[in-house]
């Protein structure tokens, strides 16, 4: 296990005393101090708190932010937190998607809407950029789609 090696880079996680007795660094002076999440070494498949949980782990250290038993897109493992300095190398939305989601359904990098809305007035483009973040694409919209976007997002623009 990790404890036999030289001390790794500090894990910035609070360790929970009610976790299993074998939780790494459960003492107050343990290797972690300062993460919002909660790290524990899960030795049994689930439901350590007496609640039914579908979070199945075995001998893996997991971060449970805000004392939650159900990991969501916000749950980042402690090693990733340490390795990337608290930031993920990809966007949080993209990181939360499973590997089988095709590229066509993944979110694309979004450009400001006002770059495509060159023909509108200043007020119209401001409204459009505020209400149409999903209208941007890698290519400029056609005249028909531009008119449709203007009608849907900016009904006041003429």
Curated annotation (Swiss-Prot):
Region: Disordered, residue numbers: 1-26
Pfam entry (one): DUF4568
Name this polypeptide is given: Uncharacterized protein C16orf95
Highest taxon above the source species: Eukaryota
InterPro entries named in the record: DUF4568 (IPR027919)
